[in-house]
Every structure is written in C-alpha cells, then in structure tokens.
C-alpha cells in the first residue's frame, strides 16, 4: 500500500506542481491542494493510466482527501 500512496502523491505533485514533501494523504483536494472538478477528472485519468485500471465507478462526491482515493485503486488492483 505504501507504494500506491507514494505513486498517487507523486502524480499529484507532478501534475499540480506541488512539492511532494508538502503532500499528505490527509490533504483535502479542494481546500488544501486547490484541485477543482476539472483537475479531479484529469487526476483520475492519470491514476487510471499509472495503475492500468479504470475508475469509472469512483464516487467523486465521497473523495475529499487524497487518502479517499487509495481504496478504489487497491480494490481495482486486487481484481487483476
């Protein structure tokens, strides 16, 4: 799981030009990282590409923090 956490943080850091050391799994996507709905869609697409999964069933309204995304990725990876 640590590898997944790091990879998610790395993608966010690169895409949104944020120092990875300043990214915590507890960061609120909207309030802390200023990620809007368009950015969120882009983030999901990048995660799908990185992990070679589809996150079409992700419940966007339930995703508030970075750590909320991790279970979706883990669930999809376990199905492989």
From Swiss-Prot:
Subcellular location: Cytoplasm
Keywords of the record: Cytoplasm, Fatty acid biosynthesis, Fatty acid metabolism, Lipid biosynthesis, Lipid metabolism, Phosphopantetheine, Phosphoprotein
Keyword Phosphoprotein (UniProt): yes
Record family assignment: Belongs to the acyl carrier protein (ACP) family.
Pathway: Lipid metabolism; fatty acid biosynthesis
Species in which this protein is naturally found: Buchnera aphidicola subsp. Cinara cedri (strain Cc)
Protein's job: Carrier of the growing fatty acid chain in fatty acid biosynthesis.
Protein name: Acyl carrier protein
GO molecular function, one term: acyl carrier activity
InterPro entries listed in its UniProt record: ACP, ACP-like_sf, PP-bd_ACP
Pfam family, one: PP-binding
Gene Ontology cellular-component annotations: cytoplasm
Modified residues (O-(pantetheine 4'-phosphoryl)serine): 37
Superkingdom assignment: Bacteria
Major localization class: cytoplasm
Post-translational modification summary for this protein: 4'-phosphopantetheine is transferred from CoA to a specific serine of apo-ACP by AcpS. This modification is essential for activity because fatty acids are bound in thioester linkage to the sulfhydryl of the prosthetic group.
Carrier domain residues: 2-77
């Amino acid at each position: 799981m640590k590898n997944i956490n790091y990879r998610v943080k790395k993608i966010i850091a690169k895409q949104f030009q944020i120092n990875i050391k300043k990214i915590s799994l507890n960061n609120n996507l909207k309030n802390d990282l200023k990620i809007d709905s368009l950015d969120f869609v882009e983030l999901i697409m990048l995660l799908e590409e990185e992990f070679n999964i589809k996150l079409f069933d992700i419940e966007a309204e339930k995703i508030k923090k970075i750590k909320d995304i991790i279970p979706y990725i883990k669930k999809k990876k376990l199905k492989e």
